[in-house]
């Protein structure tokens, strides 16, 4: 049975699926750990690789660990997260390939974010778990690599292949915070280099 409450809930859910586009200047003013080339990141910041630490071969189980990690990191950062997402540069062939493998909900999120807003740059504020889960799935499935910038507890993480995500920190205390969070979700930060 359909009622007004469901209609309202659907409307609220829909609105929360739109990322907020920000300018490159806004991004630069808010984000401390940023660089154009990943090699610069490795040279300038303490870093490590976020990887699965369990013994389960199921991709879905592994992906769930990353989704849980990123959602808890979002909470830890009080919803203060920026991502880069090059959605306006997607060619039709690439978009079709991505849409083929997404479930309906993720397809709608992607299409809505391509069509329903003015895009100021490649940077977007992300402040809810549905969107964080969506971005995580794009990364883990190697469909679209997004960099995720956490602001409250500064850390930057690059989307990457083979469920191995480079993480960058300014200071060992941030490394320990995220390392503890990773362990909680059957992940680990490996290959740590301190600067």
Where on the chain are the PLM-derived regions?
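Structured alpha/beta or helical-core interaction and ligand-binding surfaces enriched in interleaved
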Residues: 1-164, 169-195
């Amino acid at each position: 049975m359909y009622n007004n409450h469901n209609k309202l809930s659907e409307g609220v859910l829909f609105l929360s699926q739109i990322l907020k586009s920000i300018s490159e200047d806004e991004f630069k003013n808010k984000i401390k750990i940023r660089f154009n080339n990943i090699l610069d990141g490795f040279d300038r910041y303490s870093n490590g690789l976020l990887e699965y630490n369990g013994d389960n071969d199921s991709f879905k189980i592994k992906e769930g660990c990353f989704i849980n990690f990123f959602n808890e990191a979002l909470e830890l950062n009080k919803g203060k997260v920026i991502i880069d997402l090059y959605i306006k540069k997607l060619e039709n062939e690439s978009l079709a390939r991505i849409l083929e493998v997404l479930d309906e909900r993720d397809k709608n999120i992607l299409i809505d974010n391509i069509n329903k807003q003015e895009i100021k740059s490649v940077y977007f504020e992300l402040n809810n778990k549905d969107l964080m889960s969506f971005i995580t799935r794009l990364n883990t499935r190697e469909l679209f690599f997004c960099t995720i910038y956490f602001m409250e507890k500064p850390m930057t993480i690059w989307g990457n292949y083979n469920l191995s995500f480079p993480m960058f920190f300014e200071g060992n205390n941030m490394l320990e915070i995220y390392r503890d969070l990773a362990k909680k979700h059957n992940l680990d930060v490996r290959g740590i280099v301190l600067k």
